[in-house]
A protein has these predicted regions:
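Thiol-based oxidoreductase modules, predominantly thioredoxin-like and allied folds used
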Residues: 79-99
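N-terminal leader/targeting and pre-domain segments
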Residues: 20-50, 138-141
Length: 141
């Protein structure tokens, strides 16, 4: 009887020690959203009534921390978020309310990266600054 129990117990012990299969999450890169990337000058010209314009820099630590969340949102909600790579032509401003209700690119600017505008009918309606505010907005949208 004892010999019969040894075999199943040994099998259970061996199986419990086997390495578990790890499910690896998909890692996205900005190249995965090339079709959703626009230039700063086109930020108010997208053919959509309502969308987010996400301004980022590939060298920005905070941008990289939320990169997976933002790209996933954009891929799941196609056509509702566009990526704007930061460049030296984008004005840096101090007052985050400055871009609100503006309908000309020349009147826009960002406080820093990451930043995100909500654009409705080619007018900036909201300005989100920083990783926490952006992730919160996309999570609640």
């Amino acid at each position: 009887m004892n010999k019969l129990l040894i075999l199943p117990i040994t099998a259970i012990l061996i199986l419990s020690c086997s390495p578990k299969k790890e499910t690896k999450a998909i890692e996205y890169d900005y190249s995965d959203v090339d079709d959703l990337t626009i230039f700063w000058n086109d930020i108010l010209s997208v053919e959509s009534d309502k969308y987010f314009a996400y301004i980022y820099s590939p060298t920005c630590g905070h941008c990289n921390e939320i990169k997976q969340d933002v790209i996933t949102y954009a891929l799941v909600n196609k056509g509702t978020l566009y990526f704007v790579p930061f460049n030296k032509m984008i004005p840096i401003i101090i007052d985050r309310t400055l871009p609100l209700e503006k309908d000309k690119v020349e009147d826009l600017g960002i406080v820093g990266t990451p930043s995100m505008f909500l654009v409705v009918n080619h007018v900036v309606k909201e300005n989100y600054v920083g990783k926490k505010e952006i992730v919160k907005t996309l999570t609640n949208d």
